Structures are given as C-alpha cells and as structure tokens.
Curated annotation (Swiss-Prot):
This is Pregnancy-associated glycoprotein 55. GO terms for biological process: proteolysis. Belongs to the peptidase A1 family. Its EC number is 3.4.23.-. GO terms for molecular function: aspartic-type endopeptidase activity. The gene is PAG55. The lineage of its organism: Eukaryota, Metazoa, Chordata, Craniata, Vertebrata. The keyword Transcription does not apply.
C-alpha cells in the first residue's frame, strides 16, 4: 500500500475501505 495521503487523494473511497478493513482486523 502506498502512502495514505496519495491513496486518499487518488482513491478516497478506496482508502476509507482499506482503513475500515485494517481497523476491523486491528480491533
């Protein structure tokens, strides 16, 4: 996964989904 900033700029929805996915695994 590239830097969160670039991912957020290029694919905001994709970045949010990744954050939720990773957050679910972490929690």
């Amino acid at each position: 996964i590239s830097s969160p900033v670039s991912x957020l700029t290029i694919h905001p929805l994709r970045n949010i989904m990744d954050m939720l996915y990773v957050g679910x695994i972490t929690i």
